C-alpha cells in the first residue's frame, strides 16, 4: 500500500517592522512542530526583500532548523543561482547535508528576474 508524504513550503512573509529574531524564532518553531507532526519535508527559499522576507540564506536557516529537528528533510526552495558561484553553492549544500545527517535537499532556480 502506498504511503502519502507531506511537506511544507515556508514563504517567509512577516509583518513589516517585526523584529527579525522573532521572525526566525517563529519560523524555526514551525519546523520543529512539523517534525513532531511527522511531516516528511520542509522547504524555504532565498529572499532578499527587506522587512518582510527575511531568509537571505536558506542554507543557514536550514542548518539552524536541522539542529532543532530530527527526521524531517530540509530543502532549499530555491537557491537563486545567478547570485552565487556554483562551487560555493555546492560546498554549502554538502556542509548542510553533513550537518543535518543527510536530510538536505537541493532546489535551485533563477530567483527574481530584473
Please name every model-derived segment:
Residues 2-22, 83-114:
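Flexible, glycine-rich active-site loops centered on histidine and acidic residues
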